[in-house]
């Protein structure tokens, strides 16, 4: 290779180097500009990082503060939960005690042996009373039949009238011979005739008063007494239905067959109350009427005094019957083995807290209102 070629090659290499140098300088300028821009971006980023770190610090402090407050709230809540747990345990103990008392009361309520014994005793007493009333009914029927039989009195009146006619005929035969005596005798006979007429009128008035007033008054008194018996029967049936409904609601089933049979046996006894009421009236009535009949046969002038005695007997007998029924009701409604609730008036084997809760009361409020000595069980009555 010649020198010229070397020189040309070096010139070409110098030109290429110059171009490369220019390109490198251009690139260096661009790189410096990019470095400057990146430095500016880094500065901005550093500032942003600083601000973000400050915000993070504030946020961390806020989270720490919130954590402390939350921990305090949790501690307070745990304390409340512990207190509520103690209250719940106390309530649980109270409910368990109440459940024991309630189970005892239910067992007492379900024990109706005493009630069945009382019902059996009542049935026996009512059967005996039924027999007594039947005997009174027979006596009353016999007395009424005796009072209605006045054939002997009518026969005596007929005999008396025939005797009066015979005497009058005898005096007429002697009239011609003994005018003066006959006139006097006629006057005496006329007076006696007037007396007989007055006696007959008094007897007719008494008979009319007895059959129209006394007997009707007696029948009305009997009807009133039968009406009272019917009202009492209706009240008894209403009370029986209420008791059956209460027993069904309380025990959750109907009354047993044995109790139903007891009630069925009690109904015929009540149905015979009308006959028994008539039997109660009969002795006094029969005595008064028989006394009046004897006074008619012996002393006609005292006929009117017998009526008031007969008139007063049915009412007195009815009052005695009502007093007897009232005493029997009192004895039935106040059994010895039960105690009365002062609020509702019903009888129970014991006045318990669950029952008083139905009246919006407690045992202490019940004692405050009706006294500390108010009985809660049958043993407390003594």
Curated annotation (Swiss-Prot):
Composition bias, Acidic residues: 260-302, 317-336
Induction, per UniProt: Maximally transcribed in late log phase, probably part of a gvpC1-gvpN1 operon. Also part of a gvpA-gvpC-gvpN operon. Gas vesicles appear earlier when grown in static culture, possibly due to O(2)-limitation.
Known partners and oligomeric status: Forms homodimers, interacts with GvpF1, GvpH1, GvpI1, GvpL1, GvpN1 and GvpO1 via its C-terminus (residues 329-382).
Major subcellular site: other
Ranges annotated as biased composition (Basic and acidic residues): 1-18, 365-382
Gene Ontology BP, a term: regulation of DNA-templated transcription
Region described as 7 X approximate tandem repeats: spans on this chain: 22-284
Spans annotated as Disordered: 1-21, 260-382
The organism of origin for this protein: Halobacterium salinarum (strain ATCC 700922 / JCM 11081 / NRC-1) (Halobacterium halobium)
Family: Belongs to the halobacterial gas vesicle GvpC family.
Sequence repeat residues: 22-60, 61-92, 93-130, 131-168, 169-200, 201-240, 241-284
Any one Gene Ontology cellular component term annotated for this protein: gas vesicle
Comp. bias (Low complexity): 303-316
Note: Encoded in a 14-gene plasmid locus called p-vac which produces predominantly short, spindle-shaped gas vesicles during all stages of growth.
Any one Pfam family match given in the protein's UniProt record, by short name: ROS_MUCR
Subcellular location: Gas vesicle; Cytoplasm
Biotechnological applications: Can be used for presentation of peptidyl epitopes in the mammalian immune system. Modification of this protein to include a 6 residue epitope elicts strong antibody responses without the injection of extra adjuvant. An insert carrying 168 amino acids of gag from simian immunodeficiency virus in this protein evoked a long-lived immune response and immunologic memory (IgG) in the absence of additional adjuvant when injected into mice, suggesting it has the potential to be used for vaccine production. Fusion of mouse bactericidal permeability-increasing protein (Bpi, the first 199 residues) with GvpC increases survival in mice against LPS-induced endotoxic shock if administered before bacterial infection. Mice have fewer symptoms of inflammation.
Keywords: Cytoplasm, Gas vesicle, Plasmid, Repeat
GO molecular function: DNA binding; zinc ion binding
InterPro entries from the UniProt entry: Gas-vesicle_GvpC_halobac, ROS/MUCR_sf, ROS_MUCR
Gene3D superfamilies tied to this protein: 1.20.1170.10, ROS/MUCR transcriptional regulator protein (1.10.10.1550)
This protein's name: Gas vesicle protein C1
Changes seen on gene knockout: Many small variable-shape gas vesicles, in situ. Makes increased amounts of gas vesicles, their shape is highly variable, in H.volcanii.
Record's function text: Confers stability, involved in shaping gas vesicles. Gas vesicles are hollow, gas filled proteinaceous nanostructures found in several microbial planktonic microorganisms. They allow positioning of halobacteria at the optimal depth for growth in the poorly aerated, shallow brine pools of their habitat.
């Amino acid at each position: 290779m010649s020198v010229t070629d070397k020189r040309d090659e070096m010139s070409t290499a110098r030109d290429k180097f110059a171009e490369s140098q220019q390109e490198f300088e251009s690139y260096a300028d661009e790189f410096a500009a990019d470095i400057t821009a990146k430095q500016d971006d880094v500065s901005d980023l550093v500032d942003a990082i600083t601000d973000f770190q400050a915000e993070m610090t504030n946020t961390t402090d806020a989270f720490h503060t919130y954590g402390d407050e939350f921990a305090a709230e949790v501690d307070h809540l745990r304390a409340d939960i512990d207190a509520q747990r103690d209250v719940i345990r106390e309530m649980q103990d109270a409910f368990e005690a109440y459940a024991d008392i309630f189970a005892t009361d239910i067992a007492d309520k379900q024990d109706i042996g005493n009630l069945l014994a009382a019902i059996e005793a009542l049935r026996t007493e009512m059967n005996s009373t039924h027999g007594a009333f039947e005997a009174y009914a027979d006596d009353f029927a016999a007395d009424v039949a005796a009072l209605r039989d006045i054939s002997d009195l009518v026969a005596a009146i007929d005999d008396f009238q025939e005797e009066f006619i015979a005497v009058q005929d005898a005096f007429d035969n002697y009239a011609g011979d003994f005018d003066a005596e006959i006139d006097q005798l006629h006057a005496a006979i006329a007076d006696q005739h007037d007396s007989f007429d007055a006696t007959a009128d008094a007897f007719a008035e008494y008979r009319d008063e007895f059959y129209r007033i006394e007997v009707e008054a007696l029948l009305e008194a009997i009807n009133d007494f039968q009406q009272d018996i019917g009202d009492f029967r209706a009240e008894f049936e209403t009370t029986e239905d209420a008791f059956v409904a209460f027993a069904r609601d309380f025990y959750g089933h109907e009354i047993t067959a044995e109790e139903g049979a007891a009630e069925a046996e009690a109904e015929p006894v009540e149905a015979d109350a009308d006959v028994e009421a008539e039997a109660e009236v009969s002795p006094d009535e029969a005595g008064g009427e028989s006394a009046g009949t004897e006074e008619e046969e012996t002393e006609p002038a005292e006929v009117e005094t017998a009526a008031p005695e007969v008139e007063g007997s049915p009412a007195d007998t009815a009052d005695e019957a009502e007093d007897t029924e009232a005493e029997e009701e009192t004895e039935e409604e106040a059994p010895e083995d039960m105690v009365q609730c002062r609020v509702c008036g019903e009888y129970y084997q014991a006045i318990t807290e669950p029952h008083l809760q139905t009246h919006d009361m407690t045992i202490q409020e019940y004692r405050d209102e009706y006294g500390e000595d108010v009985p809660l069980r049958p043993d407390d009555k003594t």
